[in-house]
Amino acid sequence: MSFFESGSMDVSSFDLTLLVLHVWQYTGYSNKYICDTLPKGKQLGIPNFKKLQRKLKSKNKFIGTLEGKILNLDLSNPHRFNTCEYNSQHGKNQLESIVRMAGSPQSLKIREDEFREMCE
């Protein structure tokens, strides 16, 4: 996956776990925490998840999945973590700060500048 000249990345052919993998890589956290844990269509499993969660929370930056649910950092309240099912009615609201959903979970668009703002 890579960003196109438009500043957006079309990830419509990828499932959420691969999207999350890209987010983790983009935000600069070592992929040693998630290597070999993201077969397409499977739930995300992370060794030492609690340790990783604390590390990310201390930097106020996090997006990931746990047991098939989205764990999302609410950027307006950096210490509040919310979980929701990806396809729930609340999914769009939970993710709108980081991921723009264009109509359905199958058509996700991510803007590079949004990630850069999140990482600053």
Curated annotation (Swiss-Prot):
Domain of life of the native organism: Viruses
Protein name, per record: Uncharacterized protein R820
Organism classification: Viruses, Varidnaviria, Bamfordvirae, Nucleocytoviricota, Megaviricetes
